[in-house]
Amino acid sequence: MTASGKHRPMGARELVLLALLGALLLVTKLALAWLPNIEPVSLLVLVYTAVLGWKALAPVYVYVMMEILIWGLGFWNLCYTYVWLVLVVLAMLFRKMESPLGWAVLSGAFGLSFGALCALVYWVTGGWAFALSWWVSGIPFDLLHCAGNFAMALVLLLPPLCRYKLKRGQGRMCLALYFAYLAAALLLPRAGA
């Protein structure tokens, strides 16, 4: 907000950053696509929300639109329009939480509930029986999603230096440090392979 109380318009630099963060969601998901329901999207959405606040919705919906452009429109896209919003809202509610374990539990719980949240679309389109059968058949994948989200958040989410920077209001620096940390964590183990 400006001194007059109005929101300032988004500049080109900020617009490009938000678009690139959305693209990063897709690229990191595709990089780990060979693992069933193990993806860093939830982790990055939590980081984006911690650093950017409500502006994290912009990269989230850039990601959703790119998913639709690549994979086509389907019922699963409909759930993406609200499921990621749920995660951003939860992250905003717990934004001041400092416990890495708390963030890991939030991320894991989101992964576990992902199928149930997505089943709402199938309830509207096919009724309770269809939604319930769809959700139950996906529980093994929700368990993998839960475990992956929990582990990634516990290990990678907001390392100590990043949390220190956030407290000092240096969000952009925190985001840059986080991505350097994430890239090192994901790429270094492969260097010896």
Where on the chain are the PLM-derived regions?
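Hydrophobic side chains within alpha-helical segments
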Residues: 32, 42-45, 70, 122, ...
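Membrane-embedded alpha-helical hairpins and interfacial helices in multi-pass inner-membrane proteins
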Residues: 75-81, 97-193
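Interfacial aromatic-anchored transmembrane helix boundaries in multi-pass membrane proteins
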Residues: 26-39, 62-97, 126
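Short hydrophobic alpha-helical segments that form membrane-spanning helices or hydrophobic packing faces
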Residues: 59-62, 155-157
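Residue-level signature of the transmembrane alpha-helical core
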Residues: 19, 23, 47, 61-65, ...
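Glycosyltransferase-associated regions of secretory-pathway enzymes
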Residues: 5, 10-13, 93, 171, ...
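Hydrophobic transmembrane alpha-helices
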Residues: 1-51, 55-59, 87-95, 157, 161
